[in-house]
Amino acid sequence: RSSDLFNVNPMAGVIFWTHGDHIHIMDEIELPNADTEYMMSHVRDEYKVTLDGVEYSRVEDVYPDASGNSRSTTAPGGKSDFYYIRQAGCHVFAKGANPLIRDRENAVNGLLNHGRLTISPKCKKLKSYLLKYNHESKHKPDQKAMSHLIDATGYPVHYLFPVNRPATVLATVGH
């Protein structure tokens, strides 16, 4: 799975897997001056597996910025960014509009605080950014540069584990 593909410089994404109520980010991507078509080509090349002589992508689902459904002036041919994700054989998971930044931040922080979001040591930038990022200073240049990978983390976390998700009863005891 991957996410956030519509910032141009850099275009950022995270590669992750989920298991139950846990999400693990295994890689981070920042590509300067990239478009969605190039990002998807990069993802397909970097995260493929060959079985019985047939290549498969290990990335099947993408949780992008919701604005990618509109036609893009940066996308070749005026096609939407979602078009290029689907052309790469991936499913797009995005709601009609992006969740509020605070909601994404709360979803990420909630999972981190409960040990349900883990990040590979390989993701040095993301780990550093999460420690340094400050919502109140988000428009300062150093904070803005960090926001791309943070957004790439926030979109899938909020989509899959929103802070307002109803609680699930895992077991009933004593009845």
Regions found by a protein language model. Give the residues of each.
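Mg2+-dependent endonuclease catalytic cores in nucleic-acid-processing enzymes, primarily RNase H-like
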Residues: V14, H19-D142, V163-N164, V169-H175
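Structural motif
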Residues: D142-H148
